[in-house]
Amino acid sequence: EIDGWYVDKCIKKVKLPTLNPGKIEIEIEIPFFLRGRTEWCYVLGDFGVNVTGKFVTAVNKAKKLAFGSAVNQTLPFYTGNITYHTGYTETKKAHRTLQISNFGGALARVKADGKDLGVVAISPYCIDLGEMEKGWHDIEITVFGTRFNNFGPVHNNVKNYAYWGPNSWRTYDSPMWTDQYNLRPTGI
């Protein structure tokens, strides 16, 4: 029974019964023919995932994320946005710039003390915070995810692959294929 859609109206959701801990096999029957390819299937829910090489295990989802890739914090296939709440104490009034030089995402939106300062998307990955008064300042950074770890060619074994096209996914009969997951870092 169809129960809504995921990301795009063409990707239908089917409700599963409650799954209990342990080894679970889900069998899917679909039409398959020579010129067709199977598409990805996803198990969606409020749980985390650990990926070790080619092995994937459902686990409890992390309650909070630390700085570092969400891939290693039970969210390897999460491709939505991640908002970080942090802050600092300014010891004297000063003009400040924030640099976010290492984030995995399409861009990052920055707010300081609730004021939207704009986005960071290209080198040198800096944003002007302006004049910051003495005292505590809340900083909010939202990293906008990409769909790579969800829909990308995560079994392509070529590092720094220069071309993304149909054959980027169809690597099963070549040295480009690997059973392990090659995921991109997401978050800060």
Briefly describe each language-model feature range.
Residues 1, 26, 88-90, 94-114, ...:
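Aromatic-lined ligand-binding clefts that engage carbohydrates, nucleic acids, or primary amines
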Residues 2-7, 73-83, 117-123:
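Extracellular beta-rich ligand/substrate-recognition surface
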Residues 7-9, 19, 40, 81, ...:
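Active-site-proximal structural scaffolding
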Residues 8-25, 127-136, 147:
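Short, surface-exposed tryptophan/glycine-enriched loops
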Residues 12-14, 78-90, 124-127:
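Short beta-strands within extracellular/lumenal beta-sheet-rich domains
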Residues 17, 29-33, 50, 89-91, ...:
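Solvent-exposed residues in well-ordered beta-strands and their adjoining turns
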Residues 31-60, 144-188:
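Glycine/proline-rich low-complexity spacer/linker segments in large multi-domain proteins
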Residues 56-87:
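Edge strands and adjacent loops of beta-rich recognition modules
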